[in-house]
Amino acid sequence: MQDGIHPNYQETSVTCGCGNTFTTRSTRPELKIDICSECHPFYTGKLKYVDTAGRIDKFQKKFAAGTYGSLQKKKAKKATK
């Protein structure tokens, strides 16, 4: 291998949004993640909504009426002369 062209491969501290911290190796000194194996529903067996930037709230607000009729487009007004 050539000297000086490869990135520095070092120990990295990974911090999850739930507070879990672990170390691994990477070219970055620190990583911040939203979800890890300690809080992911697949690994914990608990149902948990992972809401990124309020997407669930936005969806519920958009479809709050809940009826199909409210989702249809309104009729166009008659043209006047």
From Swiss-Prot:
GO CC terms in record: ribonucleoprotein complex; ribosome
Cofactor note: Binds 1 zinc ion per subunit.
MF-aspect GO terms: metal ion binding; rRNA binding; structural constituent of ribosome
Cofactor(s) in the UniProt record: Zn(2+)
Binding locations of Zn(2+): 16, 18, 36, 39
Gene Ontology terms describing biological process: translation
Keywords, alphabetical: Metal-binding, Ribonucleoprotein, Ribosomal protein, RNA-binding, rRNA-binding, Zinc
Disulfide bond sites: none
Described function: Binds the 23S rRNA.
Quaternary state and interactors: Part of the 50S ribosomal subunit.
Family: Belongs to the bacterial ribosomal protein bL31 family. Type A subfamily.
NCBIfam families cross-referenced by the UniProt entry: L31, PRK00019.1, PRK00528.1
UniProt protein name: Large ribosomal subunit protein bL31
